[in-house]
């Protein structure tokens, strides 16, 4: 899983 996607998910949550 890419850190960029994780950052986006964290931003949404």
Curated annotation (Swiss-Prot):
Expressed by the skin glands. Keywords: Amidation, Amphibian defense peptide, Antibiotic, Antimicrobial, Secreted. GO terms for biological process: defense response to bacterium. Disulfide bonds: none annotated. It is found in: Secreted. The modification Leucine amide is found at residue 13. GO terms for cellular component: extracellular region. The keyword Phosphoprotein does not apply. It comes from the Eukaryota. Its main location: secreted. The keyword Secreted applies. Belongs to the frog skin active peptide (FSAP) family. Temporin subfamily. Antimicrobial peptide. This is Temporin-1LT. It comes from Rana latastei. The lineage of its organism: Eukaryota, Metazoa, Chordata, Craniata, Vertebrata.
């Amino acid at each position: 899983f890419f850190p960029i996607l994780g950052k986006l998910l964290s931003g949404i949550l």
